[in-house]
Amino acid sequence: MNLIKNGKKNLEVFKISKSEFKNLDRKIDELVKKLLIELKKKKLFLAAMESCTSGGLINAITNIPGASEVIKGGLIAYSDQEKIVHGVPKKLIEKYTVYSPEVATAMAHQIIREIKGSQIGIGITGILSRPDPKYPSKKVGQANIAVIFKEKTLIKKIYFPPQKERKKAKAIIILKTLETIREIVK
């Protein structure tokens, strides 16, 4: 999978500071409300394949009334095997690792294929709180988000300070994913 389009690398990198972890629930709710308005207005539906956020993105959206008008569905593909079962090529995982932007992009493509009627596909993968012995080169505190809409693909690589609470790490990834969805549909 090639992350270079038109001679430009299709990947943005963000380093999250500790101060950005304040008031995450409020920030997420506010962003979801804005996103719901935009998606309803444009009659768009989304679907997500989530790994490290364990369904947290879909949960955050469905916490706000009106989510059923924009969500087609989602799936949690936590293990490598589950990603493969849902169409992420095993060779892609072996070449780039399960935590890569390439795998996040494949997850986003596959969820659109799997959940019919979705125009926006989201793939989220990352390593939150413990090193993975299968992938020793991957450090704790990183995630990759891919959002696909029409012919556009936005990929965000996020680095954040390791958190004692996994909930906070998931929340920052969810916030950045919501921002990316808004960015791609504008």
Q: Regions from the language model: what does each represent?
A:
Residues 2-186:
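Short alpha-helical segments enriched in small residues
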